[in-house]
């Protein structure tokens, strides 16, 4: 009720009633501008603090640390707006200093020497000239910046996003989502930074303060804001007894080479010279079939089970039987067998095994023809005569078309080794042509003096997997083939008797192989691989040889240079005075592919590094493989999938798949480099958190126990074991290693370009997984910024550009200058090796004929004259 007694349904407060100003007349734009000006004037006058507002400011009680101001709520107090001409605060306790000339209270920042800004946080000690309290950063040597307790960087000038610091340059240093404070110099006091990453963050920010960052670069933390695993897996149960090897030789009671139908001469040679007492299961099944029957065969067996001898022994045995029947066999008696392999390395290895077997019969001659070798030398060997030929499809097709001395009329065996790989590499058309040409030129009649040889040409197809392309290859080459595989295990026999059907598997790994996987975020990939290798070679004899599989050649070059570099003096390095480093091969061929692994070595166990990829010259690849196989010292080979197929590398204990394979079959062949012939072996694959964890199900499909046969690791566990230390000291060591590697790459244009090439090639290779696995290895899920850190890069992904992907061709003058510098002994310019794409382009150019432009023009004129009539020549008519 109002004062005059009138009854109202609303209440009028004490606020004075102000008439609402109306704007009329003129254009609507002018009215709108006048309205905004009036509103701004009213807002400015109402925001001016009064004495009542100042003294009613929320207060903090230092004794109880409880909010006692007006209208207490759970929200944090907001920042108080202060005018430019206002320099004192009221209502604060004794620990809050008032603004005075040149003195700032705790939690305040002097920005530009004029405006004062406070964050109204817990009382802190005021800045003293020349001394900074914990959590402070002196920027530019003049301005002092106080960091909030929440860990946000102060706004020194302009507008900086949270987690950024302006170091006096034009650009801000971003910590990639890091919001914790840093200590620029000195040591961190205990408990000065929230969380458990104080040591690691200190190392990052010391790197910035010491000038290790250039404008536009990003120095990020390793152990923060990494994606976590989204799936939980049961720990594998401990096996009561170790698994029985599935590819081991049989016991002498079960089978001997003599019982398989081999002659005493060959069986004695295998047992005495080659130290082979008994065959494997697949050798037992194959030799018995191929010695006594002339039908085609498909040999399927897991990797490392001895498929090479499974088809070589029957061929050699039947040729030996021919010579024992009174027929004189020599090198010009004819070509009896052709063996096709997909790669040059496998071709060389088959030839090496054949050479060992033929030592018992030196009159039988075998040789090889493959790409990368001199055609003239191969023609000379073929002209002398050969009985068994090991070849790659492309080079054999070339010789069949252009080499007249290659007579395939007497060929009785055609072996297609690694049939799935032959089809994947695109040799289908070459194999079709080879089969047709051999069929047309072969002798149909059976000679009486060759009774022990097959009456018809026998085709043998070998593969560890049964895929659609292998079946298509079988349709091309096989006729009424016999499927040969090892005898089933006792467990499989029992399941079959009980009516349990065998599970369809994408691949079958040896049972004695210990398979594990590691969930590693992209940022931690490099330090995790380093820690894993350090741990593997920590003690002498723990691991003899290891293979690291990487997806592309440029990445192989980068990691080889990284692990073989000379570390900084502050790092843990091998003391050459305390330990004798193993001698490296003196051959000029391998000086760029073999080096000391200083990063992963220690004083008690030095390691030798090897690298191998398809862009290397053939003679270099052969020499590197030979050095790795024959080395008696601990060694690591960093390679692409060129070393994953068929190569029998002795004493390989550990296989690391740093980059996931492009298909499940590639994984089978990779891990098949270890756990061979019944020996134990370990394999570990790197997977990133998220969708890549679905690949664990594919890994488990290769084992009878499924996921129980797999062991799970985390990046933190592997890094802690590799770098060691007390407590969480391993984090600081890993961070120091990462920063050191980044400095190493930034200090040299050569290594920086190698890192960028490796990064870009890795991304291109990541997009080439098979279609049915592309949802697991999805490019959209890849964090390019975190992945760049794994290549020691500080650039943003969008600014990583590789100069010289297609460099200009070297002129004659440039070559002359380089030759003169080399003659004077001057050091050549430090450049990165050519990228993988450039090397492939040069290989294509090598196959093109070199044609002079003037000569081509002259030929064209002569050709035109031949087709011109006399009338047209003299412009008649």
UniProtKB/Swiss-Prot annotation:
A motif (Q motif) lies at residues 255-284. Gene3D superfamilies: P-loop containing nucleotide triphosphate hydrolases. CDD domains: DEADc_DDX31, SF2_C_DEAD. GO terms for biological process: endonucleolytic cleavage in ITS1 upstream of 5.8S rRNA from tricistronic rRNA transcript (SSU-rRNA, 5.8S rRNA, LSU-rRNA). GO terms for cellular component: nucleolus. It catalyses: ATP + H2O = ADP + phosphate + H(+). Residues 288-484 form the Helicase ATP-binding domain. The keyword rRNA processing applies. Its EC number is 3.6.4.13. Residues 85-98 have a biased composition (Polar residues). It holds the Pfam family Helicase_C. ATP binds at residues 301-308. Keywords: ATP-binding, Helicase, Hydrolase, Nucleotide-binding, Nucleus, Ribosome biogenesis, RNA-binding, rRNA processing. A motif (DEAD box) lies at residues 417-420. Residues 34-101, 814-845 are annotated as: Disordered. It is found in: Nucleus, Nucleolus. The Q motif is unique to and characteristic of the DEAD box family of RNA helicases and controls ATP binding and hydrolysis. ATP-binding RNA helicase involved in the biogenesis of 60S ribosomal subunits and is required for the normal formation of 25S and 5.8S rRNAs. Belongs to the DEAD box helicase family. DDX31/DBP7 subfamily. This is ATP-dependent RNA helicase dbp7. The gene is dbp7.
